[in-house]
């Protein structure tokens, strides 16, 4: 049975006012069943129930962090599992969504990379994470105004489904997000970066998980990184900027004794010369079985200072949800202290 959420809002069943009602129930009210759509005639609800599946998830579990972040573990209808993270701030509500079950990139410092690749998520399974998280938090899906494609998976290797999901996120009759508040992260798929630049109707932001400025180190920590050299990635980033005019963010996880040497800061600054960019330095978040540890605060500061002295726009990103296994690099289907929650609650 097809999943309703896999459809573009313009292609939803029903017409006119009834279609508008259906979209409002799904994307504003966030209900998880057709039966809950009480202003639709009973016969119409039964017809929709017989033709479409509304809920992409069989079950959901949550792990709550002391800082308010929540890790959501989703069991899909085929039994596979993946995760998303909800991060409330004083001025905004942000969600980090997955685009795959597992990940083929195999970054050595990332727990998801150790899982390997399961399968691509469909557009509805990506969008459904937003709806389910909103239901779990007791808010309207439209209250989540910031979204990052930074969970499990490489979005540019699930290109069509990721772009289809992004179009639903931005659609005014669906979630109506601002393109300036949606960021797609990639390990550096040069062909995908250039392709993204040509998506004129999207305009979402780009973040590249670079993590090292030299080929030897990058291939050590990102085995699949050899598919695209750093030069190829940087060339694609420049092409992207030339087409879109948008700044590019570089993500850089700080690994003690691996990529935190000051000569690497200097080389990174050289790589970024002429590119309007921002560097996010991310202290590595610990997880069981990792061979890496985070750089010291002192070394992170020294690396930061070296970049800043070269005129690089740089910040240190403090991760949320570490105690819940929900921080960057920790997503691996671990669920200490989890509780089962209702999926798709209004």
UniProtKB/Swiss-Prot annotation:
Domain called Radical SAM core: residue spans: 89-323
UniProt family annotation: Belongs to the radical SAM superfamily. RlmN family.
Keywords: 4Fe-4S, Cytoplasm, Disulfide bond, Iron, Iron-sulfur, Metal-binding, Methyltransferase, rRNA processing, S-adenosyl-L-methionine, Transferase, tRNA processing
InterPro entries for the chain: Aldolase_TIM (IPR013785), Methyltransferase_A (IPR040072), RlmN_N (IPR048641), RNA_MTrfase_RlmN (IPR027492), rRNA_lsu_MTrfase_RlmN/Cfr (IPR004383), rSAM (IPR007197)
NCBIfam families, per database record: rRNA_mod_RlmN
One GO-annotated biological process of the protein: rRNA base methylation
Cofactor (UniProt): [4Fe-4S] cluster
Protein's name according to its UniProt entry: Probable dual-specificity RNA methyltransferase RlmN
SS bond partners: 96-328
Functional note: Specifically methylates position 2 of adenine 2503 in 23S rRNA and position 2 of adenine 37 in tRNAs.
GO cellular component labels: cytoplasm
Molecular function terms from GO: 4 iron, 4 sulfur cluster binding; metal ion binding; rRNA (adenine(2503)-C2-)-methyltransferase activity; rRNA binding; tRNA (adenine(37)-C2)-methyltransferase activity; tRNA binding
Keyword Transferase: yes
Highest rank taxon of the organism: Bacteria
Gene this chain is encoded by: rlmN
Residues noted as binding [4Fe-4S] cluster in the record, renumbered to the chain: 103, 107, 110
E.C. number(s) listed in UniProt: 2.1.1.192
Additional free-text comment from the UniProt record: Reaction proceeds by a ping-pong mechanism involving intermediate methylation of a conserved cysteine residue.
Catalytic activity: adenosine(2503) in 23S rRNA + 2 reduced [2Fe-2S]-[ferredoxin] + 2 S-adenosyl-L-methionine = 2-methyladenosine(2503) in 23S rRNA + 5'-deoxyadenosine + L-methionine + 2 oxidized [2Fe-2S]-[ferredoxin] + S-adenosyl-L-homocysteine; adenosine(37) in tRNA + 2 reduced [2Fe-2S]-[ferredoxin] + 2 S-adenosyl-L-methionine = 2-methyladenosine(37) in tRNA + 5'-deoxyadenosine + L-methionine + 2 oxidized [2Fe-2S]-[ferredoxin] + S-adenosyl-L-homocysteine
Compartment(s) where it occurs, according to its Swiss-Prot or TrEMBL record: Cytoplasm
Keyword 4Fe-4S appears in the UniProt entry: yes
């Amino acid at each position: 049975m097809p999943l309703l959420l896999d459809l573009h809002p313009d292609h939803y069943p029903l017409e006119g006012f009834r279609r508008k009602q259906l979209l409002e129930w799904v994307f504003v009210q966030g209900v998880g069943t057709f039966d809950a759509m009480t202003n639709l005639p009973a016969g119409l609800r039964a017809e929709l129930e017989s033709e479409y599946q509304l809920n992409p998830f069989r079950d959901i579990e949550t792990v709550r962090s002391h800082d308010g972040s929540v890790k959501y573990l989703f069991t899909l209808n085929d039994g596979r599992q993946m995760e998303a993270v909800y991060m409330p701030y004083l001025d905004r509500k942000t969600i980090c969504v997955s685009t795959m079950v597992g990940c083929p990139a195999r970054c050595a410092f990332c727990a998801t990379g150790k899982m390997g690749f399961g399968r691509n998520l469909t557009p509805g399974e990506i969008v459904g994470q937003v709806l389910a998280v909103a239901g779990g938090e007791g808010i309207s899906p439209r209250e989540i105004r910031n979204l990052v494609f930074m969970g499990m998976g490489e979005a540019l290797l699930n290109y069509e489904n990721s772009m289809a999901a992004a179009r639903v996120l931005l659609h005014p009759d669906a979630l109506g997000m601002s393109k300036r508040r949606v960021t797609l992260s990639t390990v550096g798929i040069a062909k995908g970066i250039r392709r993204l630049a040509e998506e004129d109707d999207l305009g979402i932001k780009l973040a590249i998980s670079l993590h090292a400025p030299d080929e030897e180190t990058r291939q050590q920590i990102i085995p699949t990184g050899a598919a695209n050299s750093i030069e190829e990635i940087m060339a694609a980033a420049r092409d992207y900027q030339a087409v879109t005019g948008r700044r590019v963010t570089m993500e850089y996880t700080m690994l003690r004794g691996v990529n935190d040497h000051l000569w690497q800061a200097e080389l990174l600054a050289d790589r970024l010369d002429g590119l309007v960019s921002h560097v996010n330095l991310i202290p590595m978040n610990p997880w069981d079985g990792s061979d890496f540890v985070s750089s010291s605060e002192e070394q992170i500061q020294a690396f930061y200072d070296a970049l800043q002295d070269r005129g690089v726009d740089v910040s240190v990103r403090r991760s949320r949800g570490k105690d819940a296994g929900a921080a960057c690099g920790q997503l691996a289907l671990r669920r200490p202290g989890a509780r089962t929650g209702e999926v798709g609650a209004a």
